[in-house]
Swiss-Prot record:
CDD domains, sorted: ATP-synt_Fo_b
Coiled-coil ranges per UniProt: none
Gene (name only): atpF
InterPro entries from the UniProt entry: ATP_synth_B-like_membr_sf, ATP_synth_b/b'su_bac/chlpt
Subcellular locations according to the entry: Cell inner membrane
MF annotations from Gene Ontology: proton-transporting ATP synthase activity, rotational mechanism
Designated name of the protein: ATP synthase subunit b
Record's subunit section: F-type ATPases have 2 components, F(1) - the catalytic core - and F(0) - the membrane proton channel. F(1) has five subunits: alpha(3), beta(3), gamma(1), delta(1), epsilon(1). F(0) has three main subunits: a(1), b(2) and c(10-14). The alpha and beta chains form an alternating ring which encloses part of the gamma chain. F(1) is attached to F(0) by a central stalk formed by the gamma and epsilon chains, while a peripheral stalk is formed by the delta and b chains.
Annotated function: F(1)F(0) ATP synthase produces ATP from ADP in the presence of a proton or sodium gradient. F-type ATPases consist of two structural domains, F(1) containing the extramembraneous catalytic core and F(0) containing the membrane proton channel, linked together by a central stalk and a peripheral stalk. During catalysis, ATP synthesis in the catalytic domain of F(1) is coupled via a rotary mechanism of the central stalk subunits to proton translocation. Component of the F(0) channel, it forms part of the peripheral stalk, linking F(1) to F(0).
Bilayer-spanning residue ranges: 2-22
Amino acid sequence: MFVVKMVLGFLILLSPLCATGLDISQTDIIERSLNFLLFVGILWYFLAKKLRSFLRSKSLEISKRLEEIQAQLKVSKENKKKLLKELEQAKEKAELIISDANKEAYTITQKYELQTKMDVENLIKNSKALMDLEVKKIKRELVESVFKDLRESKKVSFNAQDCVNILKQRL
């Protein structure tokens, strides 16, 4: 089949020479063309099987390599899916950890705010109690100093019952 195509192609190439009207009777173009075709046919006969086997082996090598690459691609896609799934799980876990940390921080903040509020209230109560004690102490000292001054002045005379009544009313 190939030889027939080659001969037809050669004849088509020579057709313009025939149409020009040149005298080719003195040339040996036909003999050379036949020798060339014969040479190509013999080469084809001896090399066709080797060429076909070579091309088949190359195509088999290419197909094997393609299959290997496709297998690697499939493994890579599976690994990618697996890693993406792990990434999503890690993101979910991170969000859970963050939300737990926020809740715990809020709880701790509330606890310390409550404790601080209670401490402040206790300090205020203690301060008021200390102030009340100091006021009573100052009143008592003032009353004692006034009574002491009055007793020492001897202008006013008090008995013990009068002192007790006055102290009860003022303190």
